[in-house]
Amino acid sequence: MGFFSSTQPPRPATVPSDEIIPLHFWNTALCMRGTVLDISLKFDDVLDTSKLRSALEELLEMKDWRQLGARLRMNPNGRLEYHIPTRFDASRPAFAMTNAQHETSIADHPLGARIPHATSTPAIFPSPDVLSPLLRSEDAPKNIDDWICSDRPQLSIHIITFSDATLITVTWLHTLTDVMGMALILNAWTALLRGNREAVPKLQGFRLDPLTELGQRTPAEKYMHFNRVFGRKEFWWFIGLNVLDRLWYRQEERRTICIPAASLRNLCQQSSSEICASRGKEEPVPFVSESDVLLGWWVRSLYSALGLRTDQTILVNNALNLRTSLHESFTSNNSAYMGNALCMSPTFLRGHQVADEPLGQIALRIRESVTEQRTPEQVEAMTALQMQTMEQTGYLALVGDPRMMLLSCSNWHKARLFDIDFSSAVLQSSGPSSLQNPQHTGKPCYVNGVQHSANSFRNVLSVIGKDAGGNWWLTGVLRTDAWTHIEKQLHKLGSS
């Protein structure tokens, strides 16, 4: 059963001694309630599970961090609350941790051998979901009912050890935090593994939410795309067209992509040359990031793969991290924001632009659009708009036109998951990168990301990040027939 089920199991009684904190509006959106996230880290090292447990126990006993051990409840009014135990013990632990131990090499395990690895040419791998029987424990939560109808803590961690590798999977409901917030948890965990308590920041986001103040500074009407915000008619028109698309193209797949460092370097050089060619000799060359170039390549590939029209609006929605957009609103030198702190930054393109313009120009359009929308005034106006829409509908606001093609991107690379350092828990290293460069010891060589939801993630791209070798990892969900074209584009990229 899930959030939209008509019947639910009985819910546990309230523990009188628990501290009760209502969830803030940003974390209660229907899309947050309906999504469970898994992040799995693969290490070419054997890690000490007892050290991992002890450090995480220490973290969740620290004053502000105890809130992560809260139980999720829904009150009689249908509102979500955190119930924080006064103390954690074996009957009510701060987190759930399970272990599976294999005495063999990970290469000898039928699923372990299928974990993607870096390649010399662009490659596409099966859905990351196929690894779930290995990466998740049997009782790992899959929907909101698994929290509100039990006394389960917010974090579920499953650790799988082999003779030459370790896998760590963290599972949580999106109401708790986004991927950037999970990176804060992982980095605080590893800081305590090193014995560095001073590196653990204080947490904001549970009792007081700076997003509420952020949404009251600037009126929503000052948002640059306010005149394109969907009303009720446009919203249901857009939903109806998307339902028809899913009825016509019923099959969809999530796949993992590896873009080798050399291939992306060629794409970036191509983009830079194209941007330079379009400007005068005296004009400075504008900045575009590797992520901009990757997203531009993805949009161009989907234009053909999905059979889009030249006159069609294509909305590229980039997830904008509010933590970095407005530093003074969220963090001081010793504090960090825990929760969902995202706005979508739309870039409007026309089909003919994607078809006719060079890759560099598309990447530049994406970069310029993001830059325009991350000013304090625009972020504040976007936040005000989302607050108003959430209060009225429970949904996040949409902009554009109902007939547009919506392509969304979540850039996990900003969380630097491949840089998280568990080296203080390493018992034995076996990976080639660790042997060649000790700085890679205890850092993930692969990151697996999966969203569990009754909702479709079609046309959503997650940029997982860049590994130690400079290779980029992506996961995307597309209708099944579109992946054939993506494979051709990857082959073309590898041949250039």
Swiss-Prot record:
Enzyme type, top EC level: transferase
Active site: residue positions: 174, 421
Domain of life: Eukaryota
Family to which this protein belongs: Belongs to the plant acyltransferase family.
Subunit record text: Monomer.
Description of the deletion phenotype: Drastically reduces the production of andrastin A.
InterPro entries: CAT-like_dom_sf, Sec_Metabolite_Acyltrans
Its job: Acetyltransferase; part of the gene cluster that mediates the biosynthesis of andrastins, meroterpenoid compounds that exhibit inhibitory activity against ras farnesyltransferase, suggesting that they could be promising leads for antitumor agents. The first step of the pathway is the synthesis of 3,5-dimethylorsellinic acid (DMOA) by the polyketide synthase adrD via condensation of one acetyl-CoA starter unit with 3 malonyl-CoA units and 2 methylations. DMAO is then converted to farnesyl-DMAO by the prenyltransferase adrG.
Record protein name field: Acetyltransferase adrJ
GO molecular function, one term: acyltransferase activity
Organism (species): Penicillium roqueforti
Keyword Iron: no
Keyword annotations of the record: Acyltransferase, Transferase
GO biological process, one term: terpenoid biosynthetic process
EC number: 2.3.1.-
Pathway assignment: Secondary metabolite biosynthesis; terpenoid biosynthesis
